[in-house]
């Protein structure tokens, strides 16, 4: 169905996180059949289904195409907002100050928790050392310019984001809280799952960037009423969406804090098609 701003049909906006929510398996990028069926049906009915994720576009593209999506996408938690299906939509890219990021990463409390990190822009990546799990989620090897090892002399001064892995025993919430309190004037910090049994990933984006702001833009662009907005997520980087959307849905595998903030907590996990079951019964 073609998008029509003047349409009188009641349409919903489903703003959906990828890892731990829409995807049944982050490593393989698989989608539960129930979720795939429900999303395709919603799109065919004219509803807006938007992916808002910490991933870059290169590792979001296969999912976007598989589901037949046609709406705005938010990558890097909103640092890159674009619509691959609309050549007339002007993309928005927000960059980080590299010097400020390196200052944050040099903090002893932060540095001792980091096991690997990557600095990246829309078409380039520098990764400290190879890691198949991290590379599968972020599609680093698909970047136009990929470099193993961080060469500070050859990094553009304006990356879009930084991602870093932490130790398996890192207290995620404690570190996230520390980053926000200590460096909240320099950037936005979030943490999310990159797959079952794997350590969480942290990311840093420019100040003022979060998923909730992407929802605000999307609802205005498509003329969606606030009452008809639904956010679906499982981790800490999804909380900003919950502050904007009218209905907040989490799968059974979501972090306890996310469940506490949710309007609806599904019985199913992401692996069991939680997103599909909710949309199908909306």
UniProtKB/Swiss-Prot annotation:
Cofactor(s) essential for the protein: Mg(2+)
Keywords: Hydrolase, Magnesium, Metal-binding
Protein residues bound to Mg(2+): 17, 19, 234-235
Record-listed E.C. numbers: 3.1.3.-
Membrane-spanning residues: none
UniProt keyword Electron transport present: no
Any single Gene Ontology cellular-component annotation: cytosol
InterPro entries reported for this sequence: Cof, HAD-like_sf, HAD-SF_hydro_IIB, HAD_sf
Sample GO molecular function, one term: magnesium ion binding
Residues annotated as catalytic: 17
Residues reported to bind phosphate: 18, 53-54, 211, 237
One Pfam match: Hydrolase_3
SUPFAM superfamilies on file: HAD-like
Record NCBIfam families: Cof-subfamily (TIGR00099), HAD-SF-IIB (TIGR01484)
Family membership noted in the UniProt record: Belongs to the HAD-like hydrolase superfamily. Cof family.
Protein name: Putative phosphatase in upp 3'region
Source organism (scientific name): Metamycoplasma hominis (Mycoplasma hominis)
């Amino acid at each position: 169905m073609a998008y029509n701003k003047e349409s009188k049909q009641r349409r919903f906006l489903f703003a959906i996180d990828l890892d731990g929510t829409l995807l049944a398996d982050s490593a393989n990028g698989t989608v539960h059949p129930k979720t795939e069926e429900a999303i395709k049906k919603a799109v065919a009915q004219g509803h807006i289904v938007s992916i808002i994720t910490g991933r870059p576009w290169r590792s979001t593209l296969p999912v976007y195409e598989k589901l037949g999506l046609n709406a705005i996408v938010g990558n890097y938690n909103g640092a890159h907002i674009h619509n691959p299906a609309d050549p007339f939509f002007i993309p928005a890219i927000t960059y980080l100050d590299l010097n400020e990021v390196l200052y944050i990463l040099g903090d002893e409390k932060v540095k001792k928790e980091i096991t690997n990190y990557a600095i990246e822009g829309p078409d380039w990546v520098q990764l400290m050392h190879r890691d198949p799990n991290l590379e599968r989620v972020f599609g680093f090897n698909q970047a136009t310019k990929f470099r193993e090892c961080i060469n500070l002399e050859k990094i553009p001064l304006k990356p879009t984001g930084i991602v870093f892995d932490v130790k398996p025993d890192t207290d995620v919430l404690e570190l996230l809280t520390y980053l926000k309190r200590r460096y909240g004037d320099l950037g936005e910090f979030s943490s999310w799952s990159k797959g079952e049994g794997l350590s969480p990933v942290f990311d840093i984006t420019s100040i003022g960037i979060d998923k909730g702001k992407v929802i605000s833009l999307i609802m205005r662009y498509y003329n969606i009423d606030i009452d008809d907005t639904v956010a679906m997520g499982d981790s800490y980087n999804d909380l900003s969406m919950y502050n904007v959307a009218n209905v907040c849905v989490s799968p059974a595998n979501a972090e306890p804090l996310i469940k506490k903030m949710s309007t609806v907590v599904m019985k199913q996990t992401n692996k069991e098609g939680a997103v599909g079951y909710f949309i199908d019964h909306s």
